[in-house]
């Protein structure tokens, strides 16, 4: 049984990765219903939280049915990060996660996200201070290193563990790679095989088929953190679990299942943000829910341009009739 501190999360847990503009409460809840063992929020700016920015504060919303759920924060200023932790703690997450892996320029340029891979002393200092600040278990998501010449993930993992981190998720690329090339899980395996390590080590990056999840398990890693493969496909977690258990594949989601999922997503988004914003927020998911269906473009266009829930539901009914 894998544990994050005292939280039991299964023998080989599947975690939903924090993804900006994707991992909102409705999507997380759907992934949880479909096999995700732990879910993480979109990353939240520590500076935004302490400014009381609405865009940051709403990312702290969680449903009880999501638990265990982690709220991920990012930043490079110690005082701001500690104040952000105080704010986050009031929302009662099960886990607080620190983002030391985002490769995006606007984050990295401030020394946050993967930018901190250039300053491991600051990484350790921030982690240790956050762990001391909160009673909530602290985890970290990071990358192999800044570039191919500075891959220090074994050292990084040791230092994070020494600082009190309760689990680490590692994306198998460097910052300079962004999302190009293949994720290299062998470095993550080295972290797990380090006799000094005793906290869970999760692999992330390119785990987009059940077979690849099996490879992660075969490497002896504690679990898999799944990101892009789940977009438009919350069923992926159950597909992976079924394959790990039976070595067979579940049939792909039918049109009726896709329509039902899109409808539920919209309903939850409306319940979360109201009709106007709920309709708007769900638009970005339709292309992925109906990906690969021939001649779907006219229906997708209607779904992403409709402003009223009734119009979206009408289009979804037509999809059922036509396909």
Residue ranges and their predicted role:
Residues 1-5, 10, 20, 25-26, ...:
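Alpha/beta catalytic cores of nucleotide-metabolism and tRNA/nucleoside-modifying enzymes
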Residues 1-5, 10, 19-94:
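Glycine-rich, positively charged N-terminal anion/phosphate-binding segment
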Residues 2-15, 47-68, 102, 108-110, ...:
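N-terminal small/glycine-rich loop or linker at the start of catalytic domains
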Residues 14-17, 39-41, 69-73, 96, ...:
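Hydrophobic faces of well-ordered beta-strands that scaffold small-molecule active sites
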Residues 19-21, 44-46, 74-76, 101-103, ...:
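Active-site beta-loop-alpha junctions enriched in small/polar residues
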Residues 82-112, 121-199:
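Alpha/beta enzyme core
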Residues 117:
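Aromatic- and acidic-residue-enriched carbohydrate-binding clefts of CAZyme catalytic domains
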């Amino acid at each position: 049984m894998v544990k994050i501190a005292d939280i039991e999360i299964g023998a080989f847990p599947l975690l939903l990765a924090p993804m900006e503009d994707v991992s909102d409460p409705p999507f997380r809840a759907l992934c949880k219903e479909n096999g995700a063992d732990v879910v993480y929020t979109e990353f939240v700016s520590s500076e935004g939280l302490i400014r009381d920015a609405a865009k940051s504060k709403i990312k702290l919303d969680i449903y009880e049915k999501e638990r265990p759920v982690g709220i991920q924060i990012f930043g490079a200023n110690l005082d701001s990060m500690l104040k952000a932790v105080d704010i986050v703690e009031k929302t009662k997450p099960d886990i607080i996660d620190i983002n030391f892996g985002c490769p995006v320029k606007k984050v990295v340029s401030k020394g946050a996200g993967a930018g901190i891979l250039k300053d491991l002393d600051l990484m350790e200092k921030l982690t240790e201070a956050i762990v001391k600040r909160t009673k909530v278990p602290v985890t970290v998501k990071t990358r192999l290193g800044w570039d191919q010449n500075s891959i220090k993930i074994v050292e990084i993992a040791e230092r994070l563990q020494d600082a009190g981190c309760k689990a680490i998720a590692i994306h198998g690329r460097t910052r300079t790679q962004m999302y190009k090339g293949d994720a290299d899980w062998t470095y993550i395996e080295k972290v797990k095989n380090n006799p000094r390590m005793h906290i869970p080590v999760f692999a992330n990056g390119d785990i987009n088929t059940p077979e690849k999840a099996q490879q992660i398990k075969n490497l002896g890693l504690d679990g898999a953190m799944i990101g892009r493969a789940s977009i438009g496909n919350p069923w992926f977690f159950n597909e992976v679990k079924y394959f790990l258990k039976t070595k067979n594949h579940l049939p792909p989601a039918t049109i009726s299942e896709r329509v039902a999922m899109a409808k539920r997503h919209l309903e939850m988004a409306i319940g979360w943000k109201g009709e106007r914003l709920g309709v708007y927020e769900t638009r970005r998911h339709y292309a992925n829910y109906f990906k690969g269906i021939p001649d779907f473009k006219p229906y997708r266009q209607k779904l992403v341009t409709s402003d009223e829930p009734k119009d979206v539901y009408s289009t979804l009914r037509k999809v059922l009739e036509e396909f």
